[in-house]
Amino acid sequence: MLRVPLLVLCLALSVGADYYGYGWGRNGGGGGSGGGSGSSRASASASASARANSIGNLVGRLTSLVDASASARASASANAGGFGGSGAGGSGGNGFGGGSGGSGFGGGSGGSGFGGGSGGSGFGGGSGGSGFGGGSGGSGFGGGSGGSGFGGASASASAQALASATAELQAAQDAYDQASAYAEATARAAANGGSLDSSALASAIASAEASVSARGASIIARARARAEATVRAARRSFASAQASAEASVSAVRSAEGRARSFARAVARARASARAAIAGVRSSGRAFASATARARASVSAAARAVARARAQAVARARASIRASASASARASASAAAEARAAAYARVQVAAAAAARAAASAASASASASASGSSFGSGGSGGSGNGGFGSFGASANAVANAFAQAFGGGLGNGGNGGNGNGGNGGNGGNGNGGNGGNGNGGNGGNGNGGNGGNGGNGNGGNGGNGNGGNGRNGNGGNGRNGNGGNGGNGNGRNGRGGRYYYGSSDYYY
């Protein structure tokens, strides 16, 4: 910033010294013509040459200061641009930490990359570019306008440092300008024949030199310290960013590993789900097949049960038909046998009746004398057949006749007066009723015995009238029901008996 004005000033002083003949600068003094003032001019020339040398030394120091500032600016620009970027003022390429340095003491624009950014013009950098750690106002020597950079300070601190350095340089330049103006005025006065205040000029030059040297050294020291601090901060920031980047990379790799593990787990879960679905489907098919087989088995069992039931019903019907026909045949044969037996008994009874008739004819006179009456029996075949009692003396004959003919096809005849006779045996119909016997004179009249039932019901016992009537005995039932006991004047008659084979049943 100060290089061009200082060089112009030094060139002007050197040319002026050569022009006025004071021996300042490179050419020295050529001396002057004239006689009287030779010694004074020689001393003035020597003094001016010494001053010119001092001014040259001052200019050299200022030039060194400017060069040091340029070197510091280059270093700051290199630090601001990042690692791997271009130098001060140049444009940094895209890369790990590069960026383009802009115009100014140490700033520049950093390019896009891992840690770079664009630095603006000025003492300590400008806006940072895009990248991992860059951004607007990111990278630079001491920070720039905008956001924070890779290793830079804040924009306000950089601006304050830049303003302070600029003010100090401006004060040094003002002091040097004042010294230069005073030297020119003194030189012009001496050239015009005036006196030269060498002590004042030397004092001004020394003061300017001291001021410029002190302030330049202070600026350089502060700039160096600030640059070193910035470099250390940048290195720490870079180390932190590198650690963060490595942590991020490791996190990304870990996330990728977890993602791959998750993908493998998802794949295994999908495979398991597919296997489970396949198992469920196969189980469903097996269940459907088992259900179909069970239904077929149930249908076959139902058909077998239906066939067995039909066969059992058919066998039962056939057995019932066979047993019914057998029982019918047995009943028919039994009925035929019963009819044959009854016919035989009728024949035997007829013979006995013939014999009894003869006996009855002979005994009728004695029967009339004893007060007995002859009871006429009904027809034994179809009505109330059989004979009644022939009196007390003819009970045996009457009983035999009644048993033979009393109930062939109908009921037994009624007993005559006196001791009632026994009812005839019942045939296929109902047994004959016992005759009603009248009690004898003062005797106990016995009720007639009911006839023996044939295939039908037994005859009813006769009712005994007269004295103390006894209970008539009911007829003995054969295939039918026993006859009812006769009613006496005394006790009731006893019921007949059922014959079932060889066993008796009384009621």
Curated annotation (Swiss-Prot):
Taxonomic placement: Eukaryota, Metazoa, Spiralia, Lophotrochozoa, Mollusca
Chain spans, region Disordered: 462-507
Tissue: Component of the acid-soluble and acid-insoluble organic matrix of calcified shell layers (at protein level).
Chief subcellular location: secreted
A GO cellular component annotation in the UniProt record: extracellular region
Protein keywords: Coiled coil, Secreted, Signal
Signal sequence bounds: 1-17
Domain of life of the native organism: Eukaryota
Positions with biased composition (Gly residues): 462-498
The protein's name: Glycine, alanine and asparagine-rich protein
Subcellular location: Secreted
Coiled-coil portions: 158-185
